[in-house]
């Protein structure tokens, strides 16, 4: 029987890795571990069918091998049973136990061969089979080499091992085929058919060995080495990593948890949903992490064995080679498992990140008005850019946390096994060091939470300011708003500094704890005499403590990262649980047979649920299909809220709302997406040329198209910032017309266009193109009211009157007041006495015909000039290829941190020198009998303590270097952005700037400073290790230098592609954030058109485009590290081989331990160096991107000391335009073509002209938002181009075309600089008709203003802007379409206020309403950038002037109302 099964006594001898006992026990342990994991999944499959794949049968080879395994199992079990019954009484004889264990393992192998599992189960069992076979073959080879007897069963099972290798290869091939089958399922179909799918990453089709070695990355890296990678070279994400699939799984889990009442009581449903979806795949990641931990902890034992072998009197080369083979195996397991653990955890993290980003985006599409008030656009972008993005690394930190904790425990066991009770004092000290991490972890948690709160506040303010930069520049508020951003950053920086200094002290503890603990352990050994202080013991202890130091250092960081993740989970949870729009509050259905289009009965609606008085009260409304309904009323009456009630956007308090048919919505504030004009009009619908051209003409856009360099394919900036207000409004209207909806909700669509264009839009668009549609039109243009079917008059949230035009006139009251106000404005228009209304209409028609001829001629002239077109939005710039040391030098140079950098480097050099000296002392002293243990430990402790000062200096100087750089770069970046010309903001989407202000700055804050020193530290340590190894065995330097050279080649090969991947990734992040920000601003329009699903699918594509670069970057990193580990392992194995081959006595055992201890750290140090060098190379791209914006060309200085105007300037307000020519870009055509005229002091000048004639450009030139190409502007004799911008803009007042309010309160919106008293503010409010409204609010001047003033109507926002200029009281006032969004009555009041308050001022009024400028002293008429006319309006009216034709056309548009009301 002994010959059959062998004898397995207890291991009662000294530790020997070559012993049969140890080998069989280790193999059994590994197999039992795999067995347990396998059965866990088998049990899980009984509950869920996810892991058992039906429909795919195993091949006959698997069945045959399974039968053989089962037979082998029965043999082992039978032999074991026989041994148990007939064995001897010796308790040390346990062969029957070994047989039973072997029998269980073999029968489990049989089961695993027959089970059809998912991809991950197949990988698990394949790894098990390969591990079993290789370990079995190595063990039996070792027995044969040692000359020991081999069991008969070992011979019988040898072919089984080879068959298991074959099965593992076949199993992995079948898994790859299954993955390819999955790639053609519906989930992989392109989401947007117009964008065909690229070839996916080669991982989807890679074989087992290609996956194992990351060789599937070779084609991409080879391409990147030959040329800089471009976005076209990047493959698409593999189907199983797509954002759609990730979100689908998350959404299902989320819905399940929401439906479970017990789950909703839990604090964080987002975390639970993530665990529910990704728990199972992370078990496999945990297996990799466990195997790596097991291999790392075993390495100190290998050191013990090698030193013991070198000190042995009877050295057997077979044992030496076996020890070397074990070392190779352990390093191989460590390397492969670590690389795949890192890659798999980040890949899983990427899926979580994609799922949460998409979930946050989907949520904002469903967020209620209250939810949108609680979560600003900037905050939503932050949830995506920071919180969800952080999940890409969360799983890596999580697995690091538990696996390093396990590593600490196993290392403790090894330490006790080597030195016994002597380890106890050291472990107590190590425990104390660990406990010290707890307060640090709490401090870091608090710092991180507060940092993120401060960061949210800063990014929200930054987003708001960037979106309103034009107003800020016009008002010269840059300094004040920059201080606001800097104040937010100061709060953020305070917590950043605390966090970084806390981490610096934690870093000090990490580096010092092994040194201090080792001294205490040696002291314990000496006092307790638990182990001799020889070379084996000392260097095994040092190696073990080095293994233990990694957890001590990283566990606090892991805790910090997990805490950060928990904070992000909580923030996302709060967001995803917020109120959603209640779609059941309105009933939506197809066209009704009764002909009803909109029906509201007893409707009460309120923006604020806690408000006792609803915003809209007792609304009764029934509109038939095809009716044209106008809604009018004073500012703040609730007109826009009524449209929101129809859309379901305003919370319903009571009543019913029914809408029959599809809806198209045109918002009062234009919402334009980044992209082409055509894309904005088509809005995702297929191109139908006939319908498209009809929509263009109906919205009077056909003439504008020729003004754009690329026609309707011209790229426009974010929110259409580089289009005029009229162009944006007409594009928005064309979008609605092209949509071919049933019900049209138009919110004051004509406010931003001139009277002629408004007439064209009303007649050609509303009356002709939409003649069979239902239209609800909110308007202040009274001239169109007589041509609608029904008019609703609103006051204070109620419909006070309803009926046809004539009926309402007869009723009088509110409607009569509106009409009278309009008539008062119209009747001031001077008419020649011999003109009748009929003549006027005829003149208007004749003028229109002549005007069209003029326009056509001008267009022909434009076409003949053949000026090259210029895209309004520029493609994001990025560096290409290797840029050398410039970004690194920029980082140090901008922060002026050379002194701190060299202090850090010298601190690290001093630390490494003293550490090497301390270990060399141990190696040297243990061979000298005269040196006592006290002296040995004492000198070691003194030298080690000296190194403490250096490592502390390094940690503190590094932290201060990072903080100094963060402050310098933020300051430079902020200054550059605020000083950038307006052209920069016109051509740069806000998302690009926000990406630099958020994720790039975050990298600069946290990653770059420590990356610098973490490159220096391992470089110094690597040098020290090679010097020591060369000192002991000089021959190793040959291999070491070759390995280093090869490492450099591989590293450079990798970096050529990695740099471009990171750069491209930098350009893919911004669209993701930009798209989310745009969606947040236009969510009402998106929901109204019913295009939320299309936007959602577009966003999925953007997320995938970003995710694939994260995926490839991580895969490339693992590719390079695996190869570098292999190269450095060659150096390690060479060193070990030399130590085996060198005769005994040639090298002292202490030096053997010293050399091998440094050799064991060689791979880790090189990997650490490579990883941090690559991390620094990648992170420095964020520095490069921020520095890129720090070099933006500046606009002229705010103040020029030697050119400052007198404090009383301008005392008169006279403006001279001298041959003024303006173009926006060097290659663009002239927008103003040599204008010359004079605005006399105290005059009121009206500026009129068609949309796009150059009116707004003239105002931009006056405020120097754009500099003249030639010519100049003189104010009171001073050339404004010669003085500072602040001196100019502070002396000018403007009410802009788009009224802008900022988040805060009423007081700060009226007086951002805080220079006026409350009395002055109240007086200004009274004059601008807002005092009554605000005095009724609970908080008066401190009442809140939400993002972009959304809780105030557009008209009220315009009145706030009027209040600002009333406070400033400058000598020159500009009104840029200032009354376009208010009713005629309020317009008349404002004009009266301006006449009274600015009687002695020069007032420049740009207007579309002729009555607004008709009482001006002078009128300037512009056409296509030329000054057509400039004279008194009365004189212009006496001739056949361009202005008289504009008046005539305004009369023509008002003909219905004018004829009726002039008779009243």
Swiss-Prot record:
GO cellular component, one term: cytosol
Tissue and organ distribution: Ubiquitous.
Gene Ontology MF: a single term: ATP binding
Pfam families named among the record's database cross-references: ABC_membrane (PF00664), ABC_tran (PF00005)
Residue intervals passing through the bilayer: 27-47, 61-81, 94-114, 123-143, 152-172, 203-223, 283-303, 321-343, 391-411, 413-433, 508-528, 909-929, 931-951, 1008-1028, 1030-1050, 1132-1152
Enzyme class: translocase
Binding site for ATP 1: 633-640
Subcellular location, record wording: Membrane
EC number of this enzyme: 7.6.2.2
Domain ABC transmembrane type-1 stretches: 282-564, 901-1178
Keyword flag Repeat: yes
Primary localization: membrane
InterPro entries named among the record's database cross-references: AAA+_ATPase, ABC1_TM_dom, ABC1_TM_sf, ABC_transporter-like_ATP-bd, ABC_transporter-like_CS, ABC_transporter_C-like, ABCC_6TM_D1, ABCC_6TM_D2
UniProt entry keywords in alphabetical sequence: ATP-binding, Membrane, Nucleotide-binding, Repeat, Signal, Translocase, Transmembrane, Transmembrane helix, Transport
Binding site for ATP 2: 1249-1256
Mode of membrane association: Multi-pass membrane protein
Signal sequence region: 1-22
Catalytic activity: ATP + H2O + xenobioticSide 1 = ADP + phosphate + xenobioticSide 2
Start and end residues of each ABC transporter domain: 600-821, 1215-1449
UniProt record similarity statement: Belongs to the ABC transporter superfamily. ABCC family. Conjugate transporter (TC 3.A.1.208) subfamily.
Role summary: Pump for glutathione S-conjugates.
Protein name: ABC transporter C family member 8
């Amino acid at each position: 029987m002994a010959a059959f099964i062998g004898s397995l006594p207890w291991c009662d001898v000294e530790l020997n890795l070559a012993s049969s006992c140890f080998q069989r026990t280790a193999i059994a342990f590994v197999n039992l571990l795999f067995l347990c994991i396998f059965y866990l999944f088998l049990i899980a499959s009984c509950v869920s069918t996810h892991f058992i794949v039906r429909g795919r049968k195993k091949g006959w080879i698997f069945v045959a091998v399974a039968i053989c395994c089962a037979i082998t199992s029965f043999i082992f079990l039978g032999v074991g049973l026989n041994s148990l019954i007939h064995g001897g009484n010796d308790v040390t004889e346990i062969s029957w136990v070994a047989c039973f264990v072997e029998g269980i393992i073999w029968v489990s192998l049989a089961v695993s061969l027959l089970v059809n599992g998912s991809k991950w189960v197949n990988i698990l069992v394949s790894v098990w089979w390969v591990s079993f076979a290789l370990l079995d073959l190595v063990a039996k080879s070792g027995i044969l080499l040692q000359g020991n007897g081999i069991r008969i069963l070992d011979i019988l099972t040898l072919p089984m091992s080879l068959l298991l290798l074959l099965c593992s290869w076949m199993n992995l091939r079948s898994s790859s085929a299954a993955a390819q089958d999955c790639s053609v399922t519906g989930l992989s179909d392109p989401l947007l058919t117009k964008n065909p799918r690229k070839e996916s990453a080669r991982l989807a089709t890679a074989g087992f060995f290609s996956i194992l070695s990351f060789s599937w990355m070779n084609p991409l890296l080879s391409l990147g080495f030959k040329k800089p990678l471009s976005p076209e070279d990047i493959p698409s994400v593999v189907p199983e990593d797509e954002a759609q699939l990730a979100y689908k799984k998350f959404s299902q889990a989320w819905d399940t948890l929401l439906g479970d009442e017990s789950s909703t009581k839990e604090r964080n449903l987002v975390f639970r949903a993530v665990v529910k979806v990704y728990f199972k795949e992370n078990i496999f990641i945990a297996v990799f992490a466990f195997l790596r931990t097991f291999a790392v902890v075993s390495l100190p034992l290998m050191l013990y064995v090698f030193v013991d072998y070198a000190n042995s009197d009877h050295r057997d080369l077979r044992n030496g080679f076996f020890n070397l083979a074990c070392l190779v195996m352990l390093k191989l397991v460590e390397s492969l498992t670590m690389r795949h653990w890192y890659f798999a955890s980040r890949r899983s993290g990427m899926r979580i990140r994609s799922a949460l980003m998409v979930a946050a985006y989907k949520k904002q599409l469903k967020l209620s008005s209250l939810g949108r008030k609680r979560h600003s656009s900037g905050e939503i972008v932050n949830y995506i850019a920071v919180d969800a993005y952080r999940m890409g690394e969360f799983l890596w930190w999580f697995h690091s946390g538990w696996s390093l904790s396990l590593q600490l425990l196993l290392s403790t066991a090894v330490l006790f096994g080597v030195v016994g009770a002597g380890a106890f004092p050291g472990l107590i000290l190590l425990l104390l060091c660990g406990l010290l991490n707890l307060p640090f972890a709490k401090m870091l948690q608090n710092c991180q939470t507060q940092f993120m709160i401060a960061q949210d506040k800063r990014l929200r303010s930054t987003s708001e300011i960037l979106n309103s930069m034009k107003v800020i520049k016009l008002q010269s508020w840059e300094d004040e708003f920059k201080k606001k951003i800097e104040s937010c950053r100061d709060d953020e920086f305070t917590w950043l500094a605390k966090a970084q200094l806390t981490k610096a002290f934690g870093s000090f503890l990490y580096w010092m704890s092994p040194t201090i603990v080792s001294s205490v352990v040696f002291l314990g050994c000496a006092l307790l005499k638990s182990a001799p202080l020889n070379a084996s013991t000392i260097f095994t202890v040092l190696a073990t403590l080095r293994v233990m130091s990694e957890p001590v250092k990283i566990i606090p960081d892991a805790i910090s990262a997990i805490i950060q993740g928990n904070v992000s989970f909580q923030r996302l949870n709060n967001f995803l649980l917020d109120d959603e729009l209640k779609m059941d509050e309105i009933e939506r259905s197809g066209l009704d047979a009764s002909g009803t289009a909109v029906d509201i009965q007893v409707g009460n609606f309120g923006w604020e649920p806690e408000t006792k008085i609803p915003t809209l009260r007792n609304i009764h409304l029934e509109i038939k299909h095809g009716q044209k309904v106008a809604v009018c009323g004073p500012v703040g009456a609730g007109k826009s809220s009524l449209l929101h009630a129809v859309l379901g956007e305003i919370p319903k308090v009571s009543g019913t709302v029914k809408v029959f048919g599809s809806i198209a919505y045109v918002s009062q504030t234009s919402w334009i997406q980044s992209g082409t004009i055509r894309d904005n009009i088509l809005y995702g619908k297929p191109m139908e040329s006939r319908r498209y051209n009809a929509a263009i003409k109906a919205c009077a856009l056909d003439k504008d198209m020729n003004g754009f360099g690329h026609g309707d394919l011209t790229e426009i900036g974010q929110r259409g910032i580089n289009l005029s207000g009229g162009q944006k409004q007409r594009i928005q209207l064309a979008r609605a017309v092209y949509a071919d909806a049933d019900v049209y909700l138009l919110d004051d669509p004509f406010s931003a266009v001139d009277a002629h264009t408004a007439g064209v839009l009303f007649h050609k668009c509303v009356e002709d193109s939409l003649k069979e549609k239902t239209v609800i039109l909110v308007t202040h243009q009274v001239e169109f009211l007589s041509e609608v079917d029904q008019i609703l008059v609103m006051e204070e949230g109620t419909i006070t009157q309803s009926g046809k035009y004539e009926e309402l006139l007869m009723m009088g009251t509110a409607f009569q007041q509106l009409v009278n106000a309009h008539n008062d404005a119209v009747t001031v228009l001077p008419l020649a006495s011999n003109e009748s209304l009929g003549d006027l209409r005829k003149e208007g028609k004749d003028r229109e015909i002549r005007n069209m001829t003029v326009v056509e001629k001008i267009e022909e002239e434009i076409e003949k000039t053949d000026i090259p077109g210029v895209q309004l939005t520029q493609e994001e710039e990025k560096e290409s290829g290797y840029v050398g040391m410039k970004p690194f030098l920029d980082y140090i140079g901008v922060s002026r941190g050379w002194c701190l950098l060299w202090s850090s480097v010298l601190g690290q050099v001093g630390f490494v020198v003293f550490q090497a000296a301390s270990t060399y002392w141990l190696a040297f002293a243990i061979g000298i009998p005269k040196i006592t243990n006290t002296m040995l430990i004492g000198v070691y402790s003194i030298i080690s303590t000296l190194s403490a000062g250096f490592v502390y200096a390094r940690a503190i100087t590094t932290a201060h270097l990072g903080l100094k750089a963060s402050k310098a770069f933020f300051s430079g970046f902020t200054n550059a952005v605020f000083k950038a010309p307006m052209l920069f903001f016109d051509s740069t989407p806000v998302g690009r700037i926000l990406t630099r202000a958020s994720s790039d700055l975050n990298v600069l804050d946290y990653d770059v400073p420590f990356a610098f020193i973490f490159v220096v530290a391992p470089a110094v340590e690597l040098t020290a290790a090679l010097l020591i190894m060369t000192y002991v065995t000089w021959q190793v330097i040959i291999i070491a230098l070759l390995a280093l050279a090869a490492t450099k080649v591989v590293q450079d090969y990798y970096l050529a592609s990695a740099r471009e991947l990171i750069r491209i990734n930098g350009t893919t992040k911004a669209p993701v954030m930009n798209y989310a920000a745009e969606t947040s601003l236009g969510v009402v329009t998106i929901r109204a058109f019913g295009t939320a699903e299309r936007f959602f699918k577009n966003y999925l594509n953007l997320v995938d485009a970003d995710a694939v670069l994260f995926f490839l970057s991580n895969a490339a990193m693992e590719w390079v590290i695996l190869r570098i580990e292999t190269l450095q392992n060659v150096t390690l194995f060479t060193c070990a081989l030399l130590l085996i081959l060198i005769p005994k006595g040639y090298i002292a055992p202490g030096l053997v331990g010293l050399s091998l201890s440094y050799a064991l750290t060689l791979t880790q140090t090189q990997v650490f160096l490579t990883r941090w060098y690559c991390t620094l190379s990648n992170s420095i791209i964020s520095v490069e991107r921020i520095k890129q914006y720090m070099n933006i060309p500046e606009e002229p200085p705010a103040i020029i000391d030697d050119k400052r105007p007198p404090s009383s300037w301008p005392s008169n307000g006279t403006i001279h335009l001298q041959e003024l020519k303006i173009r926006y870009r060097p290659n663009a055509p002239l927008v103003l073509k040599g204008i010359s005229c004079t605005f006399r002091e105290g005059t009121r000048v009206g500026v009129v002209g068609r949309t796009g004639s150059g009116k707004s450009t003239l105002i931009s030139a006056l405020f120097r938002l754009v500099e003249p190409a030639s010519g100049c502007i003189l104010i009171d004799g001073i050339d404004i181009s010669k003085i500072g911008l602040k001196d100019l803009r502070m002396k000018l007042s403007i009410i802009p075309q788009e009224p802008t309010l900022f988040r805060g309160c009423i007081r700060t919106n009226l007086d951002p600089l805080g220079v006026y008293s409350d009395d002055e503010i109240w007086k200004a409010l009274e004059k601008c008709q807002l005092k009554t409204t605000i005095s009724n609010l609970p908080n008066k001047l401190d009442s809140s203003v939400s993002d972009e003033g959304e809780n105030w109507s557009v008209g009220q926002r315009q009145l706030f802007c009027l209040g600002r200029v009333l406070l400033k009281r400058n000598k020159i006032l500009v009104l840029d379409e200032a009354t376009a969004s208010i009713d005629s009555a309020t317009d008349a009041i404002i004009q009266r206020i301006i006449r009274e308050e600015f009687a002695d001022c020069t007032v420049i009024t740009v207007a579309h309403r002729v009555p607004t400028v008709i009482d001006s002293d002078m009128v300037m008429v512009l056409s296509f950038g030329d000054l057509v006319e400039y004279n008194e309006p009365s004189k212009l009216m006496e001739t056949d002037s361009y202005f008289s034709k504009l008046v005539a056309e305004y009369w023509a548009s008002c003909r219905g109302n004018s004829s009726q009301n002039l008779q009243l």
